[in-house]
Curated annotation (Swiss-Prot):
One of its GO terms (biological process) is SOS response. The RecF protein is involved in DNA metabolism; it is required for DNA replication and normal SOS inducibility. RecF binds preferentially to single-stranded, linear DNA. It also seems to bind ATP. This is DNA replication and repair protein RecF. Belongs to the RecF family. The gene is recF.
Amino acid sequence: MYIDRILLKNFRNYKDETIKFSKNLNIIYGQNAQGKTNIIEAVFLCASGRSHRTSKDTELVNIDGTGFSVLLDLESSEGRKKIEIDYECGKKKVVKINEIPLKKIGNLMGNLLAVIFSPEDILIIKEGPSERRRFIDITLCQLKPSYFYDLQQYNKVLSQRNMLLKEIQYKRNLLDTLEVWDYKMAELSSRIMTTRSEFIKRLCEISKKIHLKLTDGSEIMEIKYSPSVDLHDLSNPSEIKNEFIRQLNSIRDIELKRCVTLIGPHRDDYEMELNGLNLKMFGSQGQQRTSLLSLKLAEIEIIKSETDEDPVLLLDDVMSELDFKRREFLLENIRNVQTFITCTDKELFENRNFGDNLYIRVEAGRTYY
C-alpha cells in the first residue's frame, strides 16, 4: 500500500497544493511552523476520518477559507482508490471513496492503513488511561470496522445511561428502565473487551520480541490488560456479558448516588512494564521512548499480518527524539513501508538509500522538490 499524491485546498496553511510522494522514504523538511505536520495530519485524516491533533474540524480550515478539501490517491492490493474529505463550516464532513459518498464514517476505516508516531505519543505512557485506550482503539478501528461500530454504539449507550442515572434522582419510576440499558451496555462491552484483550495479548508478544532486540536482551517488556470489570476469562463474550451485568447490579446504589456509570470499556486501561517495573512510574525518558518505538513497530507488524498490506508510516518530528542506535534500528525495520518523516534537518538521512528517497522542502504552506 502506498500513497501517490495528496491535494490540499484551504487545509491549515495550505491554500491549493498538490504533493506527490515516493513509494519509499519521504523526507519532509523545513523550519518550524511552515506546515510539515499539516501534511502528516491530512494523511491521517484520510485514514481515520479525524485529525490526530484536534477533534474540531473548524481548526483544520485555512484562516481565509470557509471549508477545506483533501484528496488522496492511493494504490493497494485492491487497486487504485481516491479518498476525498470535504468540509464546510457549519456542515458535516463529506467522505468519498472513488467519488462515491460514504453513508457512515466507519466505511472509511481500513481503506488507508496508517501508523503514526509523534512526540505526543509519550502521553500513552505518561498520562492517564484515555490516551492508552485511544492508541489501541485507533489501530483496532482500522483493522476491524465492526469494532468501530461497537465503540460508536457503546458511547451512545453510555451517554444515555448516564443521563438516565441523573433523571432517576427525581423520577424514581424510571428505575426499572435502567435494566434495558444495562443489557445493551453488557452486549457491546463484551465484544469490545474481548477484542481489546486479544489485541493487547498480540501486541505484547510482538513488542516484547522487538524490545529485546532493541535493548540487546536487557529489558523484558510486558503489556497487561486491566479492564474495569473484574474478569477471569476474557476470551468468552457470553461470560463477560453475564459477569458485567452481575457487577452492574452489585454497584447499582453507588452509581445512583454518583449519577455516572462506573464500569465498562470507557474505564479500561493497560499497564506497561519493563523487567517487572511499571514503565510510567519507574521508566527513564529513554526507556519510555524506546518502549514506544517497540509498540509502533509491533503495530506495523500486526496490521501487515492481519491485512497482507504494509501500512504507511507517519513519523512526525520523532527522529530527533531517538538516539543513533534506535534511529538506525527503526530505519532498518521500515524498508518495505512507505514512510513520511518530518524534520528540520534533512542531513540525518542523506546517507541513507532506500531506493527512492524523496526530499520535500516545506515553506509557508508551499512544497518544493
